[in-house]
Amino acid sequence: MPSLKDLKNRIGSVKSTQKITKAMQLVAAAKLKRAQEAATAARPYAERLAAVLANLAATTGQGGPKLLTGNGTDQTHLLVVMTAERGLAGGFNAYVAKLARLKIQQLQSEGKTVKVLTIGKKGREVLAREHSALFTGHVNLSDVKSNNFTDASLSVGQMLTKGFENGEFDVATLIYSQFKNVLSQVPTAQQLIPATAPEGAPVIDLGGAQYIYEPSEEALLEALLPRYINTQILSAMLESSAGEQASRMTAMDNATRNAKDLIKALNLKYNRARQAQITKELIEIISGAEAL
């Protein structure tokens, strides 16, 4: 049975941990508000651009740019796995890594060649245990401040576009956590190249009208497709950032509650041990007095 001193030290240690988790919860809540606002603000543009491209693609048939139609094969797949740079966020990183592993297994069972580009340190650490041989690159987001992912998304988009044009892969799929609400972040796999509109993207109703484009549909697509890919990556980074903070806030809230329960249980154990020690000392005093 632990001594009173041990119990007292443990209570103090848990109280210190509780203060840390509470502080982390408050910081995550503040960051979540900003991240959620940024993700929400980016959605209308991304959705509208996806709708415009969907309408343009419908008029070009099979003769469009390769970023839209592909290069005629789907043998080599590049998985872009986006997770957080930091842990202590519940199952946020683990769920994305799990989806990535399932996707890798599925593609390999179909005889496909798989490559992995990681964005964020935590996902890379998890996948490295089994799939480090598939890694082709890594993007570090630790220097990004205040959800300003514009430069990072542009860099990744250019990397993917150039890699596709150089024949390094045939299909690129982005795996990230889509932010639904504070309690729900959904691991999602979205094909980036060849470009496809995200599931649930709005469609522009032309009312039966036929638009004439100047310049041509092909020229517009050539200009818009790289921007569309960059926009989808930026949106995913913002969604992932909001989901990370929401998951961390929830995890730290649970940790704070658990610490409170543990302190209560330890205090009860401490009081019982102290009472038992006092009772024992009283018995010894009484026994000694009777012996006299």
UniProtKB/Swiss-Prot annotation:
It is a peripheral membrane protein. Its main location: membrane. One of its GO terms (molecular function) is ATP binding. Pfam families: ATP-synt (PF00231). The keyword Membrane applies. Belongs to the ATPase gamma chain family. This is ATP synthase gamma chain.
